[in-house]
Every structure is written in C-alpha cells, then in structure tokens.
Amino acid sequence: MAGMKIKKGDTVQIVTGKDRGLKGKVIRAIPDQNKVVVEGANRVTRHTRVQQSSRGSQSGGIVTQEAPIHVSNVMIVDPSDGRPTRVGYRFNDDGTKVRISRRTGAEL
C-alpha cells in the first residue's frame, strides 16, 4: 500500500459527503487507517462521561468534535489558484523529493 500524499497542515477540500465543497486544514493524519481529520468538517456529537480531574473541576457532557474522513474523499488545494488538485512527486536538482500539483506543476 502506498503512503498517504496528504500531510498534517495541508489545506484540503472535501469532494464527497455531507460537507462537500468545504475547505479546511488537516489537523491530524492517520496513515494506518488512510484517514485525515479536517478542521470544521465531519462534526459529530459525543456524549462523554463526567470525570473528576485532579484540580477538582469536572469535564464531560455533550461535546462536538471532528471525526476522521477517508483520504479518497478529500483533495489537496493548489496554493496558486485555490482549486483542488491531485498530488504528484518530483525530484529537485539537489535530489530532494517534493510534492507537486498535477494541474499546475507548482510545489505544494
């Protein structure tokens, strides 16, 4: 299985699902599951048990947070024009491997 081409900190656009068209930043990448967590997308409600912390405060209740999305449902956004693009790789003159936009050829 090939590695994921989307990394933490990338700006992506969701191409399928209930949040289709939404752009956001990747908060977390989960390579072993081929999933990413996108800021502000795929919000779910979790009911957490109230737990006593060491300082005496309580945490719990109903919490809204982002859930992971499969990488096939997101595309990286080209920084030159803000449109979604596929990702390719190229080697620079000094031998370093860089990600490029398949549409424009710009470095990501």
Swiss-Prot record:
Biased composition (Low complexity): 51-61
Key word Nucleus present: no
Keyword terms of this UniProt record: Ribonucleoprotein, Ribosomal protein, RNA-binding, rRNA-binding
GO biological process terms held by the UniProt record: translation
CC terms in the record's Gene Ontology section: ribonucleoprotein complex; ribosome
One Gene Ontology molecular-function label: structural constituent of ribosome
A UniProt-annotated Pfam family: ribosomal_L24
SMART domains to which the protein is assigned, alphabetical: KOW
Signal peptide range in chain numbering: none
Region: Disordered, residue numbers: 46-65
The UniProt record lists the keyword Ribosomal protein: yes
Family: Belongs to the universal ribosomal protein uL24 family.
PANTHER family: MITOCHONDRIAL RIBOSOMAL PROTEIN L24
Function comment: One of two assembly initiator proteins, it binds directly to the 5'-end of the 23S rRNA, where it nucleates assembly of the 50S subunit. One of the proteins that surrounds the polypeptide exit tunnel on the outside of the subunit.
Subunit structure: Part of the 50S ribosomal subunit.
Protein name, per record: Large ribosomal subunit protein uL24
